């Protein structure tokens, strides 16, 4: 019985390792996207509303500044240079809504779960990310894609992705709703990962 349990555990581990390696262009997807992660002070209704107001202000400010960027690196440089402005805009938005919370922001690598944004499905992985933390940052998250601008609804997703340098194959990976192969693989990783978190 112990050998059978050990064999199952080893098989599960090997499967997880195999599926943890990005395949079929996923690494290139990770390298072409800047995500946005806004974290509320708490889960209270007021703090969640403030999070959404900050989100809207950041999307407006950053989207206009990065609209002519043609790569993740270029967008990341623009966003990095704007960090003090982003914090200032977020805090102004909070003050305008009667809050005195402090805001911090940084750009770096961050792990994201699989997420769907309309017709786009981004695989779980380690992405470049603008992380904005409001107050104690103990509330619910809000995640989206800052570059290419998939959160603003300003363009068709396929056109936006192509303009940002995605290949037709990468666009298919992101937009193909008929690809259970990807869904199954990522779901297996999510389930396996949740067992150890």
Describe every region a protein language model picked out.
Residues 4-20:
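Hydrophobic membrane-insertion alpha-helices, especially the h-region
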Residues 18-31:
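Aromatic-capped interface at the extracytoplasmic side
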Residues 31, 35-68:
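Short extracytoplasmic
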Residues 33-39, 102-106, 129-133, 143-145:
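Soluble periplasmic/extracytoplasmic beta-strand elements of cell-envelope proteins
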Residues 57-69, 85-97, 153, 191:
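Structured segments of extracytoplasmic/periplasmic soluble domains
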Residues 72-113:
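Amphipathic, coiled-coil-like alpha-helical scaffolding segments used for oligomerization/assembly
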Residues 119-182:
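Soluble extracytoplasmic domains of inner/organellar membrane proteins
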Residues 173-197:
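Bioactive mature segments of secreted peptide hormones/signaling peptides processed from precursors
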């Amino acid at each position: 019985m112990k050998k059978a349990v050990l064999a199952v555990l080893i098989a599960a581990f090997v499967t997880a390792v195999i599926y943890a390696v990005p395949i079929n262009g996923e690494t290139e997807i990770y390298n072409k996207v800047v995500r946005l992660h806004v974290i509320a002070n708490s889960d209270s209704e007021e703090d969640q509303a403030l999070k959404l107001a900050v989100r809207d202000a950041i999307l407006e400010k950053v989207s206009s500044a990065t609209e002519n960027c043609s790569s993740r690196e270029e967008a990341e440089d623009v966003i990095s240079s704007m960090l003090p402005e982003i914090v200032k805009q977020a805090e102004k938005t909070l003050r305008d809504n009667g809050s005195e919370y402090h805001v911090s922001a940084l750009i770096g690598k961050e792990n994201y779960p699989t997420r769907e944004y309309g017709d786009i499905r981004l695989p779980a992985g380690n992405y470049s990310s603008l992380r904005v933390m409001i107050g104690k940052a103990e509330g619910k998250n809000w995640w989206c894609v800052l570059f290419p601008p998939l959160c603003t609804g300003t363009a068709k997703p396929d056109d936006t992705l192509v303009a940002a340098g995605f290949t037709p194959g990468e666009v298919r990976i992101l937009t193909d709703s008929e690809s259970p192969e990807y869904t199954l693989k990522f779901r297996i990783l999510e389930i396996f990962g949740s067992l150890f978190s």
